[in-house]
Amino acid sequence: MDDFSRDTENFVCWLKTTAEIEVSPKIEIKDLCCDNQGRAVVATQKIKKDETLFKIPRSSVLSVTTSQLIKDYPSLKDKFLNETGSWEGLIICILYEMEVLQERSRWAPYFKVWNKPSDMNALIFWDDNELQLLKPSLVLERIGKKEAKEMHERIIKSIKQIGGEFSRVATSFEFDNFAYIASIILSYSFDLEMQDSSVNENEEEETSEEELENERYLKSMIPLADMLNADTSKCNANLTYDSNCLKMVALRDIEKNEQVYNIYGEHPNSELLRRYGYVEWDGSKYDFGEVLLENIVEALKETFETNTEFLDRCIDILRNNANIQEFLEGEEIVLDSYDCYNNGELLPQLILLVQILTILCQIPGLCKLDIKAMERQVERIVKKCLQLIEGARATTNCSATWKRCIMKRLADYPIKKCVSIEKPSKGNSLTREELRDVMARRVLKSEIDSLQVCEETIDKNYKVIPDEKLLTNILKRKLTEEEKSSVKRPCVKK
């Protein structure tokens, strides 16, 4: 028996004895490494909807309240819950179990079925050359290495303050060790609600009316629950909670030999790779691409032959004008980037911004006005465009400008490299470099596909009217022949 199988067998034994987890005879842990899925939970018999797959007592959940560190140093509990936070606290608790207690830890068999550091593919483990494979995805701005290094330094300081045998661990707790434990928590932890134990009896009735004031979330590792692979389209089980235990329950009938899937949240492939180190090869149900504000500005400059200074003035007014903020009920419409979903959905703020800027570029003499007069005109245009978009209408040039925005964003992508992405076949073991390359291309394909779907969104979901009609309404007069000729009707090449 190899180490992988032995660790799995010991873990299953630990689940039923030490952890006292009740496991249905209809499921088993299976080795799917040949399919690049590691360990997985598979049905050995047909499971009906609402059946309980396993039941976990809260005492077998690893958190800052159940760790041996808190038992050995009771004063840390309040600090971790109220100052350090359960995230950093849980990292410290796990480090204590793994490095100080080692085989004496209650959780030792559990730790041995965690992914090994060499198997981790979350983006924090990628080197600079590998991260370049993900350009131009904005996921590169969300990796958070700087914040992670700051947390690592805080944790070393906390360990030294605890003292005793534990303080010696601080000298060898390198960033890579920290990143490993932090990524395990990010990938597999659950947030469990807990009641604020500091509430006294006299306040109980009042605070029960304000439940959110009392509820807090505890970052927790849940044995076996974290063994389920996740898929946004195949999710067939869900973790439920009560005061004494947690239950994994079937969301639908699960056939014999079918894998049991959970879901990590409504994440696109880029976020699945960043957080958890994997991608969904057929694309995530929640994939999206992102159009940049600079793409919109460049598209407008090309379409209307306007200059950057004028557009910057318009955008500054849209950002800072108090009356406009009131019209929009505090909703920001000027963002650095805008999500474009794989079902063709666009944020209303995005369409409104493109419509407003498109009209501003066509108002005669607007750029010659002083700032106060220009602000008044922009306020009026925002009102008119808001009414237009809320009525599911947009102008011809808004639609054309939007298509040009998409074209500009797509031009940043290596489209030819991402046309066809094949899922690694069973038994075809890829090197780490090969796997990361194909996962990066799958992320880019997800974003490209989403952007392409959104190109026709305005034409499909809005009644497109001539710009001249809206301009006449705004100016309260018909356009002169000269003004009519200056109203652009851009042709966007396919």
UniProtKB/Swiss-Prot annotation:
Record-listed E.C. numbers: 2.1.1.-
Gene Ontology cellular component annotations, sorted alphabetically: nucleus
Primary residence: nucleus
Intracellular or extracellular location(s): Nucleus
The SET domain, residue ranges: 25-265
SUPFAM superfamilies tied to this protein: SET domain
CDD domains: SET_SETD6
GO BP terms: methylation
Top EC class, one word: transferase
Record InterPro entries: N-lys_methylase_SETD6, SET_dom, SET_dom_sf, SETD3_SETD6_MTase, SETD6_SET
Source domain of life: Eukaryota
Alphabetical UniProt keywords: Methyltransferase, Nucleus, S-adenosyl-L-methionine, Transferase
MF GO annotations: protein-lysine N-methyltransferase activity
Pfam families documented for this protein: SET
Protein function: S-adenosyl-L-methionine-dependent protein-lysine N-methyltransferase that monomethylates 60S ribosomal protein L42 (RPL42A and RPL42B) at 'Lys-55'.
Similarity annotation: Belongs to the class V-like SAM-binding methyltransferase superfamily. Histone-lysine methyltransferase family. SETD6 subfamily.
Miscellaneous remark of the record: Present with 4010 molecules/cell in log phase SD medium.
Listed name of the protein: Ribosomal lysine N-methyltransferase 4
